[in-house]
């Protein structure tokens, strides 16, 4: 599974530059911090209204992410794989972070085998490069069904939990 896909060489070079801006020079250095150009007094009124009163109605987690990160900018990893979970790099006050978020707009944000694998891999990657992890949780649970059970949803879910437990970087869950 490719983490990124682009159409042109120019897009590829820009994507690589963007990705490298979130990462340290090596795994022994801390995650990079840049000068924050976002308005410290910025208010995102959309965040007060984005989650519907009806808990069965979905909302777009991308709007939440855009509303909370510096300048609304982030770089998503594996965007076309396991769309029920979002993995991306962003910044808070200039500090590079990895964000993992359930996407209620796709399969209600449930955890299935692929989402668990995607998130676990991202947690391990962030931990390997000292990138703090922010998790935005709105999950109804694991996807039920014989296909998931025979495929090992419990095993893959446990691997996700184990990746979080093993990670030594700062972790915040909202």
Give a label for each model feature.
Residues 1-174:
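Ligand-binding clefts of soluble mixed alpha/beta catalytic domains
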């Amino acid at each position: 599974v490719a983490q990124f896909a682009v159409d042109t060489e120019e897009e590829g070079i820009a994507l690589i530059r963007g990705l490298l801006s979130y990462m340290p020079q090596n795994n022994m250095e801390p995650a990079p911090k840049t000068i924050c150009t976002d308005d410290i007094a910025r208010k995102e009124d959309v965040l007060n209204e984005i989650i519907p009163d009806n808990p069965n109605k979905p909302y777009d987690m991308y709007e939440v992410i855009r509303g909370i990160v510096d300048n609304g900018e982030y770089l998503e990893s594996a965007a076309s794989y396991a769309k029920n979970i979002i993995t991306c790099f962003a910044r808070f006050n200039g500090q590079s972070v990895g964000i993992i978020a359930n996407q209620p707009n796709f399969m209600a944000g449930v955890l299935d085998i692929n989402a668990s694998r995607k998130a676990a891999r991202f947690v391990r990657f962030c931990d390997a490069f000292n990138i703090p992890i922010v998790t935005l949780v709105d999950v109804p649970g694991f996807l039920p069904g014989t296909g998931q059970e025979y495929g090992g949803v419990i095993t893959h879910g446990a691997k996700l939990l184990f990746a979080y437990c093993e990670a030594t970087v700062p972790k915040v869950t909202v």
